[in-house]
A protein has these predicted regions:
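Residue-level recognition of single "structural anchor" positions
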Residues: 1-213
Length: 213
């Protein structure tokens, strides 16, 4: 029974929930909560069936390390690319991925997996995006502007993700799983009850996911 509570809390908690908090709420060992939460998070991976369309912004950023957010090299830094779908009311959906390099190969792979090729895409002038104009005909590269002023929505999304990551997970270990958890919940923030049901269905259909101590 408590397994269903873990799924419910992970699915519906607005800011997410740590395994420590689950342990306190459910009177279970923290390690037990951590292992089962990882199984829940595995079911939060994108299905790839719902591409972003319309107006889409894409940007890459670093997490971890002493110079969090700055482009450069660092032993503990990890690189993430984020794409957001914009509407008149703000951001409707988003996807993200940890990547090894911000080159056209890695950026292109992510964008082909998540964005409709007919979308109106906006990026900064980073060279890694330039070759992708052959695939994404409506890709526009512009200056970031003073303090990123030409990309306010995606920079705010990045800031909120980093704040959430520090508050719930405290590290960049298992970063892709954290990205999937965050974007899954964000993309369903208007349908909390349905989110729980959807996650249960996903877990039932999913292949067994084994974790070893």
């Amino acid at each position: 029974m408590k397994a269903f509570y873990i799924v419910y809390f992970v699915a519906t908690s607005k800011k997410g929930i740590s395994s420590t908090e689950l342990s306190r709420k459910l009177w279970l060992r923290q390690k037990t909560c951590w292992y089962f939460k990882r199984k829940v998070m595995k079911a939060m991976e994108s299905s790839g069936n719902h591409l972003l369309h319309g107006n889409v912004d894409v940007d890459e950023f670093f997490v971890g390390g002493q110079e969090d957010g700055k482009k450069g090299r660092g032993k503990k830094k990890k690189l993430v690319v984020l794409a957001i779908e914009k509407t008149g009311k703000g951001i409707s959906r988003m996807y993200g991925k940890e990547i090894a390099k911000a080159d056209s190969k890695h950026l292109g792979s992510f964008m082909k997996e998540t964005i409709d090729t007919k979308a109106n895409i906006k990026t900064d002038r980073w060279l890694g995006y330039r070759p992708l104009k052959n695939t994404f005909k409506n890709l526009l590269q512009i200056d970031s502007g003073k303090k990123g002023g030409n990309f306010p929505e995606i920079h705010r999304a990045i800031m909120l993700f980093k704040s959430w990551l520090r508050g719930i997970h405290h590290s960049v270990n298992d970063l892709q799983a954290y990205i999937d958890e965050y974007t899954y919940r964000f993309n369903r923030h208007l349908m909390k009850t349905a989110t729980f049901e959807n996650l249960i269905r996903r877990m039932i259909k999913a292949k067994p996911y084994y974790l070893y101590a």
